[in-house]
Amino acid sequence: KSRLTVLAALGGPDEQRFEGSAENWSQEVPDFHVLAVECIAGPNAKYFSRTGGLPDDAFEHDGQMTKRVVRAATISALQPYPDALLWDIGSGCGSIAIEWMRAARGAEAIGIEPDEKRREMSKHNAISLGAPRFSIVDQDAPEGLEALPIPDAIFIGGGLTDEGVFDAAWTALRSGGRLVANAVTLESEAMLVRLHKDLGGTLDRIFASQAIAVGRYHGMKPFMTVTQWTVVKS
């Protein structure tokens, strides 16, 4: 059980120390105090690596999210590093942004997501997975990008073919920054092919399948194929 220690009125005549269990804390303490928490995991606590590719069920989501295998490849392509800022355009439940922040000390992320329910899910996920500094913009791109700080990396997981989204993102990205875009529709894939021809980078296809029960046997069920474009702005 996690333990709390409260040090109150330090250095004064009324200096006090309080100790107890976080679960059963009932003591009244002075307003001016220092709180120390000894975090002790419960028997059912889940331990997650900081390596990209958390289980899908680690996130609250509505089914529309970047699945684990593709997410791991996306985080690898983005190459998080300390104190770097990511824009996650079409952030959904926040899975990419949150894994970016978990992967490198001091890394920050801003999500751009117009759907209110998904914004709320992403806020919950950020707190529960240890990325409380994740911030989110409740606007569509490109309008929601205008006042944001310059990013070191950008991920476009939604809205790629919307008018002005890519141009605004590419203009904002700092020189030397990385942009990764995932496509599952033919229209967005065609756009990535054109961008790859014009700007270079790497264009990959990600195929993934997962075993499911088929009666008393099992078979491999494929996920939607993802085309991924990665480019560094020169």
Question: Locations of the language-model features?
Answer:
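Core SAM-dependent methyltransferase catalytic element
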Residues: 34-40, 215-234
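Conserved SAM-binding loop of SAM-dependent methyltransferases across substrates and taxa
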Residues: 93-105
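S-adenosyl-L-methionine
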Residues: 112-153
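Short beta->alpha hinge that forms the Motif I/post-I loop of the SAM-binding pocket
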Residues: 113-118, 158-161, 184
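Short beta-strand element of Class I
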Residues: 106-110
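A contiguous loop/helix-start segment that scaffolds small-molecule binding in enzyme catalytic cores
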Residues: 1-63
